[in-house]
Amino acid sequence: MQVVSSYGAEIKNKNIPIRHTLALYREAVRCLTEIYETVWTELSMIDQIKRRFNEAEHLVHGTKKNHARFDFDARFPKMPSYLRRAAIQHALGSVSSYHTRLEQWKNGAISGKPKLVYENHAMPVFYRNVMYKPGEESEDAACLKLYDGHDWKWFRAGLLHTDMEYLRRHWSGKKSSAPVLEKRHQKYFLRFSYTEEVTLSKTPVKDQLICSVDLGINTDAVCSIMRSDGTVLDRKFINFPSEKDRLSHVLGRIRRFQKEHGSKQIGSRWAYAKRLNTELARKTARSIAEYAHENHADVIVFEYLEMKGKISGKKRQKLHLWKKREIQTMCEHKAHRYGIRVSRVCAWNTSRLAYDGSGPVSRDPKNHNLCVFQSGKQYNCDLSASYNIGARYWIREIIKTLPETERSSLEAKVPAVKRRTSCVYADLLILQNEYGCSKAA
C-alpha cells in the first residue's frame, strides 16, 4: 500500500511577495468559480473528467487556434500555465461539489441548502522547474516564481535550517510531490509530500504479536505486548507529565484572564493551549508506534472511542481536551510506515471489569489509576484494561476463523466469549485451553 506523509518547511524571508501571489491566485480561483457556475450545464454534459477539464480550460485560455469565451487571460496576464490549471481544477471541483450537494438536498438526503462559496482558501502549488527550483544539496533555500504586482519573477526563499535538516535526514531519496504553500500562525511554509510503498504484516493470526493500547486521561497510554495464547511479553506506561503541567498552567492563566476580562481577546491563548495539546497527542502517538516497532508487533490494538453527544460534569474540560481520535489517527499513519496493522475492539467495560475475571473493580478514591478487584487484589486499572483489550482482539480473531460447528462448540464451553462487551483476559485463557483440548482430541 501507499503511505503519504508531509512536512512543512518554514519560509524565513519576509521581503518576497508571497502575499501578492496568494491574493492573485485566490482571486483567479474566485473568477473561475463564477465562470464555471454560469456554464455548468454545458460542462456537466461531459462525462470524462479529462475532456471536461480541457473544455473548461478552452473557455478561459486563448491560443492561436482557440478563441476563449471569457476574458480570464486579460484579467490575469502571464499567469504560469501549471498554476492556471491548478486554479481551474480547484474551481471545477468546487462547482461540481456544490451541484452534487444541491441534488442531495433536493432529494432529502442532506439537510440545509448548500451554498457555493466564492471566498475560497485555495493555496497555490509550486510545480518543479516551472514555479519551484530546489537549492543546492546542503543549501537551506529554494527559488520560487512569484507575482510582485507587475510581473512573475524568480525569488530566492530561505527555508528554516532545522526543517531542511529533518527533510535531508529522513526523506532524502524518497519520491516527493510538488510543494504547496501553507499559512499557519501568521507564517508561511512550503509543505512537501512524500509517497512510500509499504507492505503490511501478513503474519498468520496464531503467530502474531500484538501491542494492545489503553488510552487514558491521567496516564497517556499503557501498552502490552501479547501473544495469541495470552502470554504478556512486555508492558510500558507512556506519560508526559511536563507537557501536561505546561498545558495545565496555560489553562489556569486562561481561567484567571476570563474571570477578570471576560471571554473576549482570549483566542490567542486558547490557540496556544490547543497547539500544546496537539503536540502532546503527537508525542503519545509516536511513542506507541515506536514501542510496537521495537517489539516487532504485527498489530496495534486500540479501543473504538467514537464518543458522541454533549459532555457534562466538572471533568468535561479534560474530556474535551482528550485527543483520543487524533492519537489513533497519528499512530495509525506511523504504524503503517513501519508495516504494522491497526485494529480496534469494543471499548465497553475494558476498564470496569478486572482482567482476572473476578468482576467489576472499585477505583481507589485517592489514586484513580489504581483499583481493587473483588478478590482484594490491588492493581493498575489501565494495565488491566490493556490486557482486556488484547484479549478481545484474540478472542475475535480466533473465533471468526473457525468453522460454524467448531465455533458453536467452543461458545457452549466458554459462554463468556459470546458477548464481546464483557470479555476479559481470563476468558481468553479459558478459550485457549478449550481450543487446545479440542485440537488434541
What are the functions of these language-model segments?
Residues 1-441:
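Nucleic-acid substrate recognition interfaces
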